[in-house]
Design a protein with these regions (language model features):
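Active-site loop/oxyanion-hole signature of alpha/beta-hydrolase fold enzymes
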Residues: 34, 43-84, 240
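Flexible "cap/lid" loop of the alpha/beta hydrolase fold
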Residues: 91-94, 98-99, 104-134
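Acidic catalytic loop of the alpha/beta-hydrolase fold
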Residues: 199-203
Length: 261
């Protein structure tokens, strides 16, 4: 079964593949779609077991990356694309680079977890306890607020929450929490900007440093004052950062090298 795909912009322009975070769909890139569709060809899929690709199951990093490689090969201008990923999508982007780096021009990966998260073993049983109540409007709102999803996207967020099955959420969380650095990264020279928000846990900064150190063409920066979901919560800064990276211009002043602590 094919993935749901939305395309924007001129087909002959350089392509950008946007890979969304866990639990939401391609709609979460709406601020970037509006900012970049005028001069780039945008590929915005719903990843397996997400949004309108809910029936493409089960989710796994290797399958998702293989599907993204096929998508670039078939739909991207010239058979290659820039890749932009957030959270789960950035993990898929890492695997895509490892297995099909020749298809990727420049990459921007934000909020990429590579390390064990304390208490991860409790998340799956907690999810099953939460599942019967996940569609209660009050809980949907709390979850939306905790993830930094703006009010303007309440309807889309609520719809994705209601559509998601417990099995899908379990598959996605397992893949996310088990993700570690894949083999093959050390040979990569793709220009890659690894990002982390200042307000993310310190483990995410360590992951960013680790990922950047593993790739010859990578560099790690921290976005001052930003949360994990900053492409949606602070799109103006994210869009300036992305455009600067794609056009090989200096990064905004709000971006600083990831500190050692």
């Amino acid at each position: 079964m094919p993935l749901h795909l939305a395309e924007f912009g001129p087909a002959a322009a350089p392509s950008i593949l946007f890979l969304h975070g866990g639990g939401v769909g391609g709609w979460s890139w709406q601020p970037q779609i509006e900012a970049f569709q005028g001069d780039y060809h945008l590929l915005v899929p719903d990843l397996p077991e997400h949004g309108q690709s809910l029936d493409v199951a089960p989710f796994s990093m290797t399958d998702a990356a293989a599907r993204m490689a096929e998508l670039i090969h078939k739909r991207a201008h010239g058979g290659h694309a820039h890749v932009v990923g957030l959270s789960l999508g950035s993990q898929v982007g890492v695997v895509l680079l490892a297995v099909a780096g020749q298809l990727v021009d420049r990459a921007l990966l934000s909020g990429t977890s590579l390390r064990p998260i304390p208490g991860a073993s409790l998340i799956e049983p907690t999810l099953w306890l939460y599942a019967p109540f996940k569609n209660i409007p009050y809980l949907i709102r709390l979850n939306q607020q905790s993830l930094g999803v703006p009010e303007a996207y309440s309807a889309q967020f609520a719809q994705d929450t209601r559509l998601a099955t417990t099995r899908a959420l379990t598959n996605i969380l397992k893949a996310n929490l088990a993700f570690r650095e894949p083999p093959g990264l050390t040979r990569l020279k793709n220009p890659t900007l690894v990002l982390v928000g200042e307000k993310e846990p310190s483990i995410m900064r360590r992951s960013a440093r680790q990922l950047a150190a593993s790739m010859t063409g990578a560099t790690a920066y921290m976005a001052r004052g930003m949360i994990h979901n900053w492409p949606l919560a602070a799109p103006e800064l994210f869009n300036r950062t992305l455009r600067a990276w794609l056009t090989e211009q200096p990064l905004p002043a709000e971006l600083v090298p990831v500190p050692r602590k």
